[in-house]
Amino acid sequence: MSSPSSAEGRGQGAAPIRVALLGSTGSIGRQAVDVLAAHPEAFTVVALAAGSSAQVLGEQASRLRPAAVALGDEHALAGLDLPIGTERVGGDDALEVLAVRDDVDLVIVATGGLVSLRPVIAALTASNVVATANKETLVAGGHLVMPVARALASDRAAADPRDPYANPLAWLRPIDSEHSAIWQCLVGEGMPGVAALLLTASGGPFLDAPADLAEVTPQQALRHPTWTMGAKITIDSATLANKGLEVIEAHWLYDVEYDAIEVVIHPQSVIHSAVRFVDGSLKAQLGTPDMRLPIQYALTYPDRRPSPATAPDLVGIGSLTFRAPDEARFPALRVAREAGRLGPRASAALIVADEVAVARFLARTLEFTGIPRLLEAAVARFGVGPGEPDVDELLSLDREIRGAYATGAIGG
């Protein structure tokens, strides 16, 4: 890639940032496409990748005219009607191939699962910036990816401590609204001055529902009160598992101990997160619940550009409310904290188990309250082991946990 200082962070008139978008057909991927297409002067889309949505990928390729596309379904990839000159990239390493292309400056990772770890590490190793919405990258692999990001930042700091790229977050950029908010609150601040990170949560659709959640249906759980998201993350929001995963992400992203990461229920979803400093000050980032905002910030850092999202109308909102999370009623948050403290192996077990448990709930083979029970069982069984796992060990653990679910070794 070209040096970030020559391709990014120079405001209007800079050379377009060359982007590879992995996971372009999912919820985050489609919104990323909207952001990229809205700023053709700022971005050139070099590569697109998707898992199975061939039709959507084909439409995106026609719209953005990338140099290369990849699709998990290689038969469908061969049949795609692509613009003249667009290369088809297949194989198990397709995401890695796209992530390290010489004509790529920034890689958006909107794919799910532990399979995203390899392309993230490959991209950073190639000195490409990564903007990630993939939770597994940090929850299970934070011990693998953050040292690479910190090394890149350290090299830049040695030359100029004021360089925006002297910060690991300039290399591994969070797309989550909460982590984007904390990142923005920390700009210009030193970590020794930070007392605590405050992750806000809407509380989901069952915040004030009757106490018994065992009979909750998938349709009810998918009715998020403020955000429009994919099914998996919407269910995770309802159980508060999503917030637990974000606690683990925060630990790795900001190198902050778990005792200094707090969760606050904020039903209006206006404050996306906040930072409390040692002098008693509190800095928060406010915005409408629109994922295009954190996506765009991750792409344009350290600059800001006009966005299709609107700013919050504080007078119209009127008031903001806050409360502590009820971890007895939503135990997934507690289980996630415990997994994070145990280490990467337990965190990996947590996130794989959650993926399978949510799929079972959506298929109506597991009750809503069974989700945290399965998470706790997986962490207890698979969360302890020697040393910190590498990528191969994490992928092996993924297969082992899925096999345990399939054979009934872990029940609901």
Where are these predicted regions, by residue range?
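Catalytic, metal-anchored helix/loop core of enzyme active sites in primary metabolism
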Residues: M1-G412
